[in-house]
A protein has these predicted regions:
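Active-site and donor-binding regions of nucleotide-sugar-utilizing enzymes
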Residues: 73-172, 180
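C-terminal amphipathic helix plus adjacent low-complexity
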Residues: 343-393
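Acidic donor-binding loop of glycosyltransferase active sites
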Residues: 276-285
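C-terminal "capping" alpha-helix adjacent to the active site of nucleotide-linked donor transferases
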Residues: 319-320, 328-344
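Donor-nucleotide binding loops and adjacent catalytic segments primarily
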Residues: 195-196, 203-277
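A nucleotide-sugar donor-handling region in carbohydrate enzymes
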Residues: 156-209, 213-216, 244-245
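Conserved N-terminal ligand/cofactor-binding loop architecture of enzyme catalytic domains
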Residues: 26, 30-104
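A short alpha->beta transition loop at the rim of the catalytic pocket in nucleotide-sugar-dependent
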Residues: 278-279, 297-299
């Protein structure tokens, strides 16, 4: 132990988009602040499953979202509608991930394990059952709308992003703590002076700046959205963050629009400054990008949300009063036009975001986990489980 904290913490994440890694980095940053000297190790749970698995998962997921979103939506819906399907899917993933994680866990001997990806939670659930692990485990549910793959009964704490997220988490068999937490994002995302941010980026001081982003992959209906925004007139200046989607970046650059109207960017490390400069943020998934916008007190418009968890996140964010869902491009255009003309509505949206985050601190959430008692171990699994435990020792 380091003071009242931990000497070794294991973070389980996955390189699927950038949100899960962003959350893990933010947690590591706060651990260093809370308990200097703590050894933090981060593992990519999907890379660990098998050689090439991370690349295969990324490409399959992205192709499905781009070209066959109905397939992903059907899978997501089946997790909710058919308990047997959710249970079977979770147990297969948990067994595979747990088997691959176990030797690494034994070598590192962490005192706390925190997951920012569902597969990390699955692995720890399996190891609690099979190897009778009695160490604190937690999951930061970075989706606003929890889904069955996020929630496992042997996890001590599920940290969710809003009060509206808690009931579904409890309903999905979470028997440990369900806590509303501060978003696991960098401290750089905070309310900042908009004028200074625009000066530093060379943006127009008098413009209505719309930040459009499709996350690290630049997925979704970004081009139609950008075209609709540019048609609103000279008052609107669009910053388009294309992530690693180089084809999209090149197409936007080929438009030849003046910088006073359109600023196309690739993968950037200045997102805090871009958020601070914007009047509104337009995105399509409702993941960590939206959490960063909330922390920056920038209203979020969710346009044509991506299938599955994207649509669920959008609905729950709107229910919480923190975002406006625009089902299509026409609704996006009319909503932005209304906000350009109604600064009072913008101010109310910012106030709602600030009120939601008031008094929340990620350090407090981690300190709670470090002092929590692990859940009672599940009942023994019989001779087969005992043999597996003995042979693995």
């Amino acid at each position: 132990m380091v003071g009242d904290g931990c000497s070794r913490i294991l973070l389980l994440t996955a390189d699927i988009g950038e949100g899960h890694n962003t959350a893990a980095r933010a947690i590591a940053e706060r651990v260093d602040q809370l308990w200097p000297g703590t050894e933090v190790r981060t593992l990519d749970i999907i890379t660990m499953m098998a050689p090439g698995m991370s690349r295969l998962t990324r490409s399959t997921y992205r192709l499905t979202l781009d070209h066959a979103p109905v397939i992903y939506q059907c899978f997501y819906d089946a997790l909710w509608r058919h308990r047997w399907f959710a249970r079977l899917s979770k147990r297969v993933v948990a067994a595979w991930c747990g088997w691959r994680l176990w030797p690494r866990l034994r070598r590192f001997q962490p005192e706390v394990v925190v997951s920012t990806h569902p597969f990390g939670a699955a692995a720890m659930d399996q190891l609690r059952r099979v190897h009778r692990l009695a160490l604190p485990t937690a999951t930061f549910v970075t989706d606003f709308a929890p889904h069955p793959f996020w929630v496992f009964s042997e996890i001590d704490a599920h940290f969710v992003m809003h009060e509206v997220s808690a009931p579904d988490t409890r309903r999905l068999s979470a028997r440990g703590m369900v806590c509303v937490a501060a978003p696991p994002i960098s401290r750089m995302f905070r309310p900042r002076d908009q004028g200074e941010a625009r000066d530093s980026l060379g943006l127009r001081a008098s413009a209505f700046v719309v930040l459009v982003t499709g996350g690290a992959w630049g997925v979704g209906s970004l081009e139609p959205a950008i075209a609709a925004l540019l048609n609103l007139g000279d008052r609107v200046q669009v910053i388009a963050v294309c992530g690693r989607n180089q084809d999209l970046l090149q197409r936007l650059e080929a438009l030849g629009a003046p910088r006073s109207r359109l600023v196309p960017l690739g993968f950037v490390d200045i997102m805090p400054e871009l958020m601070a400069s914007a009047d509104v943020v337009v995105t399509n998934a409702g993941g960590v990008t939206s959490l960063e916008a909330f922390a920056s007190a920038r209203p979020v418009l969710l346009v044509d949300p991506i299938a599955g968890h994207g649509k669920a996140n959008a609905a729950m964010m709107e229910q919480a009063g923190l975002a406006v869902v625009c089902p299509g491009i026409r609704e996006l255009r009319s909503t932005v036009a209304e906000l350009v003309a109604d600064q009072g509505r913008l101010a109310k949206m910012r106030a709602a975001e600030l009120a939601h985050l008031q008094g929340r601190d990620l350090c407090d959430d981690l300190a709670l986990l470090a002092t929590a008692e692990p859940l009672p171990l599940p009942p023994g699994g019989g001779m087969r489980q005992a043999i597996r435990t003995l042979t693995a020792a």
